[in-house]
Amino acid sequence: MIIELAKNYGFCFGVKRAIKKAEQIKDAATIGPLIHNNEEISRLQKNFNVKTLENIQALSNEKKAIIRTHGITKQDLEELRKKDIEIFDATCPFVTKPQQICEQMSKEGYEVVIFGDENHPEVKGVKSYVSTKAYVVLDKKELQNIKLPNKIAVVSQTTKKPEHFMEIVNFLILKTKEVRVFNTICDATFKNQDAIKELSLKSDVMVVVGGKNSANTKQLFLIAKTNCEDSYLIETEEELKKEWFLDKKHCGISAGASTPDWIIQKVIAKIKNFKIN
């Protein structure tokens, strides 16, 4: 059986930056998980004493706080600045971009449509920078019964599929006088999604490695599953089952943007140990 890695996979720029920052700072607390990968979070806690707190209210005697890659709300940032604590911002620059756009567009009188998952921490943070009105949607149908203003700005969660974002944009163009469109989908997301699409079309089994609470990993899995019925989403090599690979000729592997290489290599090693001819 051939084992092939996607052309683009794994750690993105924002995650690499955050991990490096956490390792250098040490002895700190992150507000929410730094990234969406439980194994890497455990490694940071064990080796660098970087612990994860649920929220700002959980801070007690910590001296250093790290803002997660997904960012935090504007209100939480203001609250954090009032505390006697050193702040290190690990928000991905691709996430900071829609925050800044929302703040500026609001000042100019635009209401904002955010294409994304309302419960995702990134989207919560972005929405908090809108001072007019924000509409968070996952589908154009959610906009059909809303009385839209004359001026709308549109941004996207960084991990969404571009074609779905364009469905929202095309709907708004037909419904309102002025639409300002900002492409806030991360370039790494484009590349990883294109790569897994290409690989899944020629594989008869796919393994996607990443946190099951990771939006970009789940998106990769959905693309793989669309093209390759026998696709599996795992967090560690412990979840692999030999029967997945029996009678298979081509195994494709990809990984989410928060998945470190050391986990991916463990997955590959275990698949090889199954000794599938």
From Swiss-Prot:
Q: What is the disulfide pattern of this chain?
A: none
Cited HAMAP family: IspH
Any one biological process term the GO annotation gives? isopentenyl diphosphate biosynthetic process, methylerythritol 4-phosphate pathway
**The keyword Metal-binding is annotated on this UniProt entry:** yes
Gene name? ispH
Gene Ontology molecular function, alphabetical:
4 iron, 4 sulfur cluster binding; 4-hydroxy-3-methylbut-2-enyl diphosphate reductase activity; metal ion binding
**Binding residues annotated for [4Fe-4S] cluster, in chain numbering:** C12, C92, C186
KW Amino-acid biosynthesis (keyword) present: no
Name of the featured protein? 4-hydroxy-3-methylbut-2-enyl diphosphate reductase
Please state the span of the N-terminal signal peptide per the UniProt entry: none
Where is dimethylallyl diphosphate annotated to bind? H36, H70, H120, S214, N216, S258
In this chain, (2E)-4-hydroxy-3-methylbut-2-enyl diphosphate is annotated as bound at: H36, H70, H120, T158, S214, N216, S258
Per the similarity annotation, which family is this? Belongs to the IspH family.
Reactions this protein catalyses: isopentenyl diphosphate + 2 oxidized [2Fe-2S]-[ferredoxin] + H2O = (2E)-4-hydroxy-3-methylbut-2-enyl diphosphate + 2 reduced [2Fe-2S]-[ferredoxin] + 2 H(+); dimethylallyl diphosphate + 2 oxidized [2Fe-2S]-[ferredoxin] + H2O = (2E)-4-hydroxy-3-methylbut-2-enyl diphosphate + 2 reduced [2Fe-2S]-[ferredoxin] + 2 H(+)
